[in-house]
Design a protein with these regions (language model features):
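Residue-level signature of outer-membrane beta-barrel architecture
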Residues: 22, 63-69, 102-105, 114, ...
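Transmembrane beta-strands of outer-membrane beta-barrel proteins
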Residues: 29-37, 74-78, 110, 162-164, ...
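Residues that define the transmembrane beta-barrel architecture of outer-membrane proteins
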Residues: 53-59, 92-97, 145-149, 202-206, ...
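Detector for outer-membrane/organellar transmembrane beta-barrel domains
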Residues: 264-350
Length: 406
């Protein structure tokens, strides 16, 4: 994987140099460069499995280079990302989140390289977001993604926008190692993943999405065919000399997706729904709800938003993920101060199991012009050993992050 990333990086650097040959001085002046450093500390109040600690430190570096031609037709972007973890080597990462060339024409654009594409509208989970692999060891909510190699063609017109994707290489999901937290009791062996496709990670995945805005309604329809971004974890053959491990297996899947957003005054109504078919099973899942924003609460500059969403999965209790019959409620406070302070608090409750809950707190504010301080907290409760949350019931944590931009 590192060799492939370096190959893409070399190709993008060559593209930058080639584009600079005509007028080097003016070309380099058009490059926007941003950098960031992050320090992160996690604390787990409860003891976990053997080898697991309660304090974890990590550091990350990201660079963001962007160039646009004078006629705004050609764009180059490069965003390498490096992460180091104090204890869990599986969290160490060298990734290209962006490394692409893009051409913008009249009513269309094409892109080749590596990028991150987001689909979705709901707060509590993103069912339709299937282009990129999740960087699962980076965040619990699955919102942090790995860069995905792609060839992308977009058409824009009065009938809406059509996005077409060819995805020639698959990124495996990351899992915590023996020393990491937020993992099953058995360690996931990522050295030999299994694939249903005979092409393994080189299977050519395909995706498309049509979207259009109808007055206050935004509508999106999507289709995906390729390697499932979620892994089935299968027990490996028992070896008396080594502890039991889990092996990831990636099935082929076909998925139809629907996402919609309706704006009505202070109300935002949201829906994400999918139908997914694999060799193992077919199922339907959906998340629907609203966010109501009270502007200027208590006569101040603060904006307070109330969030409520229902999560459904037709697999019911057999679903390997939370959210099969759950409700999520939360609030979002935007202080509108010079530091851009925001606070989000949410709780998800399983309606079939009163003892199964999870909750999160996300708060952040700027410190001066070049730093941002963030506080995140998660808790997990479950007494039923068939509940996915049961595996991480002792992994409540507090996380403090400091980002420096330059």
């Amino acid at each position: 994987v590192i060799n492939r990333l370096l190959t893409v990086l070399t190709a993008l650097v060559s593209a930058f140099n080639l584009a600079a040959q005509d007028n080097p001085a003016s070309w380099y002046q058009n490059i926007n460069a941003d950098y960031s450093l992050q320090w992160q500390q996690r604390y787990y109040p409860q003891q976990g499995e053997p080898r697991q600690a309660q304090h974890y430190s990590s550091a990350a570096f990201s660079a963001d280079w962007y160039w646009q031609s004078a006629d705004r037709r050609h764009q180059l972007a490069l965003q390498p990302y490096l992460r180091w973890d104090q204890r869990d080597s599986e969290r160490n990462l060298l990734d290209l989140r962006q490394a692409y060339w893009q051409y913008v024409g009249d009513g269309f654009d094409i892109k080749a390289g590596v990028d991150i594409v987001f689909w979705g509208v709901t707060e509590s989970q993103h069912l339709v977001d299937v282009i990129n692999q999740t960087d699962a060891v980076a965040s619990v909510d699955g919102e942090t993604k790995l860069g995905q190699p792609m060839l992308n063609w977009n058409l824009h017109g009065s009938a809406g926008s059509l996005e077409l994707y060819l995805l020639p290489y698959f990124r495996e999901r990351s899992f915590a190692g023996p020393d990491g937290r937020l993992r099953p009791p058995f360690v996931v062996d990522q050295s030999q993943p299994q694939y249903e496709s005979a092409q393994d990670e080189r299977n050519l995945d395909f995706a498309l999405r049509w979207s259009r805005r109808f007055a206050a309604l935004e509508l999106g329809l999507s289709y995906f065919d390729g390697n499932n971004r979620e892994a089935l974890l299968q027990p490996t053959a028992q070896n008396t000399l080594q502890p039991q491990r889990l092996q990831p297996q990636y099935l082929q899947m076909q998925q139809l997706g629907l996402d919609s957003l309706w704006l009505s005054g202070s109300w935002i109504w949201k829906l994400e729904s999918i139908y997914r078919k694999t060799r193992q099973q077919d199922f339907v899942a959906a998340t629907a709800g609203f966010e109501y924003t009270h502007v200027g609460v208590f006569g101040s500059n603060w904006d307070l938003g109330w969030i409520a969403e229902y999560q459904y999965d037709s697999r019911d209790q057999q679903a390997p993920v939370p959210g099969q019959n759950d409700i999520f409620v939360g609030g979002r406070l935007v202080v509108n101060d010079i530091g851009g302070t925001e606070i989000l608090l949410g709780i998800a409750q399983d309606l079939d199991n009163s003892g199964s809950q999870s909750g999160k707190l996300e708060a952040s504010t700027r410190l001066g012009n070049s730093s941002r301080l963030s506080l995140d907290a998660w808790f997990f409760r479950s007494k039923l050993n068939t509940d996915p949350l049961y595996l991480i019931r002792r992994d409540d944590f507090l996380q403090l992050s400091l980002d420096y931009y330059f």
